[in-house]
Amino acid sequence: MASTYSTPRWRTALLGGFLTTLPWLSSGMAGKTQADYFIKSLPGAPEPLLKMHAGHIEVDAEHNGNLFFWHYENRHIADRQRTVLWLNGGPGCSSMDGALMEVGPYRVQADGNLHYNNGSWDEFANLLFVDQPVGTGFSYVNTDSYLTELDQMANHMVIFLEKWFGLFPEYEHDDLYIAGESYAGQHIPYIARAIVKRNKEQGKTPWALKGLLIGNGWISPVDQYLSYIPYAYQNGLMKADSDMAKRVENQQRICIKKLEDGGMDAVDTNDCEQIMVNILEETKDRKADRMNQCVNMYDIRLRDDASCGMNWPPDLASVTPYLRRPDVIQALHINPDKKTGWQECNGAVSGHFRAKKSEPSVRFLPELIPEVPTLLFSGDKDFICNHIGTEEMIKNMQWSGGKGFEVTPGVWAPKQDWTFEGEAAGSWQEARNLTYVVFYNSSHMVPFDYPRRTRDMLDRFMGVDIEQIGGVPSDSRIDGEKGPLTSVGDHPNSTRAEEDKATDVKQAEWKAYYRSGQVALVVVVIVAALWGIFLWRSRRRHTKTAYQGDDGDEGRESLLTGMGLDNFRRKERRSDLEAADFDERELDDLDGASKKPGNGYASLGSEKERQSHNDSTFSLGGDSDDEAGSSDGPKRKGGSS
């Protein structure tokens, strides 16, 4: 770390011993203040800079478990303060996907510069991205201490939030929303349940958990497994009664037998995951050019090489080298002793996180919905966590005295048409605290495709009222009705530069923390300072050891034996890397010269360029139909090992 940081750290260390005497600050946070996390500059970012904080918070002192966060302050305040905690899936995939490819204020360009994301979720909400479980992304832990169960992960997140709100108390009373996608369909309900339980404990300041948002979520494994064949038929990937279909249906029978033999409560079942793997393998067109052989499991409109989606999304080719740049690592306050580069998904984390003792979140989601408003959303072109599985799950769930979207016995809430700026955007359906949104012509990562539409969804769900701040609302209608003015129209991202006066007030509040007790407790401070120096030095040595211990697994990720989800797309690439023994940083060159994706990747980059919905919502495009239709002949079987 640059020498300019030495003075603040020395000052922090002197205060460390004194601050540990404060009841709200645990020993793991001794010596840390907001100033240590403040991002003074960010390479490639446009001016003026957004207000951001980033760094590590310790959640497991015994095993040196630290979670990395990146926080953006909201650019405008509507009627109330809100914070959105965003989590990506995997398990073991970094939430920097969400920060730099989906809902965050910046997108990374090919030249390494950042540009504003027109549609970022920080318009009216503070955004908090966390790499979790420990070991994911920039987070770290001793390599013999990866988590294995969902309850462990949820407990770490509660510890993280306790300490984070201790550092940033001005956000503790915000309305809190937890959002994410994919395997976060397990993470989010588990974390929400832990927060609800914590809020009921005596002496705790309740956190205002106001809502959950889960996109293309892995919530009900059974419903997802049994959705693969219907989805393949509905979208022309496979023809009923074909030899291909018979082989895949045989795999489904094996899956059902496994489920009936005790697999109904498993978070992942390998024999059932094989259904999708077999469909992808059977539908490969090996006569096509290399980058157009396989359907992309994350967006069936696209095709990829034999990995069936691991080269997607295309922005990853720019994000990975950006997050490995030394100046970016320094700006984000990453421990300088960390020798391995950022990885989107960590196979060591997912390999340990088998959740064998955990029940699927669908088992208790019906108990959460009455307490916490919940929104599920699906991109209709995603295969791996497709909308059919989500809809089956909703239909089968019972909560608040009804089943599915019943409003009265036997009468279901209507599915409403949603239009955005004159285009058919999707459908809305809601009843008894649950909302379900389908995005037409969208992938596994809906905000990657439609950032502004997802922000409109978020603002509607949060009940944002922009009338107090002015601005022109976007033309968003549900069944033709505009409803409340909830989302601003199309404009480049503004910044909080003009609102720095409020920031100055907050900084003044923290100066008061530093001065607190300095006159009355001078002697205590001096004595405690010596102890703080000792802790500071020993912690630096301890951290260095932990990072070095983590090297063995970074960049050498074996084929997964269970649930893949976001990790699945990198199985083949990681098995190739496992045979090589070289420094992780050499991967920068590999990613910079990565293979070009197949048909459709470049043409789907702009929200305004998406094709509008028509009567054949769930059909493939012309090219994909032809390729899928020609693959009914005998194919080599394969799958994950």
Swiss-Prot record:
Family classification: Belongs to the peptidase S10 family.
Role according to the record: Protease with a carboxypeptidase B-like function involved in the C-terminal processing of the lysine and arginine residues from protein precursors. Promotes cell fusion and is involved in the programmed cell death.
First and last residue of the signal peptide: 1-35
Keyword entries, A-Z: Apoptosis, Carboxypeptidase, Glycoprotein, Golgi apparatus, Hydrolase, Membrane, Protease, Signal, Transmembrane, Transmembrane helix
An annotated Gene Ontology molecular function: serine-type carboxypeptidase activity
Matching Pfam families: Peptidase_S10
Domain of life: Eukaryota
Gene Ontology CC entries for this record: membrane; trans-Golgi network
Organism whose genome encodes this protein: Leptosphaeria maculans (strain JN3 / isolate v23.1.3 / race Av1-4-5-6-7-8)
Cytoplasmic side: 537-641
PROSITE patterns tied to this protein: CARBOXYPEPT_SER_SER
Predominant location category: Golgi
Lumenal topological domain residue ranges: 36-515
Membrane topology value: Single-pass type I membrane protein
Keyword check for Methyltransferase: no
Source lineage: Eukaryota, Fungi, Dikarya, Ascomycota, Pezizomycotina
Name of the protein: Pheromone-processing carboxypeptidase KEX1
Record-annotated active site: 182, 382, 444
EC number: 3.4.16.6
Glycosylation sites: 118, 433, 441, 493
Span list, region Disordered: 472-502, 585-641
UniProt key word Disulfide bond: no
Gene Ontology biological-process entries: apoptotic process; proteolysis
Xref: SUPFAM superfamilies: alpha/beta-Hydrolases
Cross-referenced PANTHER family: PHEROMONE-PROCESSING CARBOXYPEPTIDASE KEX1, SERINE PROTEASE FAMILY S10 SERINE CARBOXYPEPTIDASE
Catalytic activity annotation: Preferential release of a C-terminal arginine or lysine residue
Membrane spanning stretches: 516-536
Enzyme class: hydrolase
